[in-house]
A protein has these predicted regions:
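CheY-like receiver
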Residues: 126-138
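Short leucine-rich amphipathic alpha-helices used at interfaces
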Residues: 11-12, 51, 120-121
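Short, surface-exposed amphipathic charged segments that create phosphate/polyanion-binding patches used
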Residues: 119-127
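Short acidic-hydrophobic, aromatic-tinged amphipathic segments that line or gate anion-handling sites
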Residues: 107-111
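STAS-typified acidic loop motif
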Residues: 3-39, 56
């Protein structure tokens, strides 16, 4: 049976900034796990979500079904003016994204700290546009 295998996904919200999350799946995102993965991330795909870092350090394989979930998530966030950033990609995952020309290079980061720093920068630029002072990282 496809789409019915459970997948472990760790989701954490940034305690200093509401609406910013890190999602860290474990294993593979494929035809056996994509439905469970999608179900687990669905609660944070809300209009109040400002940014998501998808940490793929523990993902060894992503199938077309898994890519579909990621593209849907990216599209939803983009429509809401939010961002989806990727970090800790294993070489085969990075190559997959390059082959399908799926992600702009500015959304791929070496690690979560680098992605988080980028989100801080983008958040401060938005705050400055609205006439407020910049926030400092916690």
């Amino acid at each position: 049976m496809t789409g019915e295998t459970e997948m472990h996904v760790k989701i954490t919200e940034n305690k200093d900034r509401a609406g910013y999350y890190t999602i860290a799946p474990f294993g593979t995102i494929d035809s056996d796990t994509y439905l469970d993965f999608n179900e687990q991330i669905a609660p944070i795909l809300a209009p109040t979500t400002k940014g998501i870092i998808l940490d793929l350090e523990n993902v060894d394989y992503i199938s077309s079904a898994g890519l579909g979930v990621l593209f849907t998530m990216k599209k939803f966030l983009k429509e809401k003016g939010s961002q989806l950033l990727f970090c800790n990609l294993k070489p085969q995952i990075k190559r997959l994204f390059e082959i399908v020309n799926a992600l702009p290079k500015e959304t791929l980061f070496k690690d979560a700290e680098e992605a988080d720093a980028y989100l801080y920068k983008m958040m401060n630029q938005e705050i400055e546009k609205q006439g407020e002072g910049p926030k400092s990282p916690q």
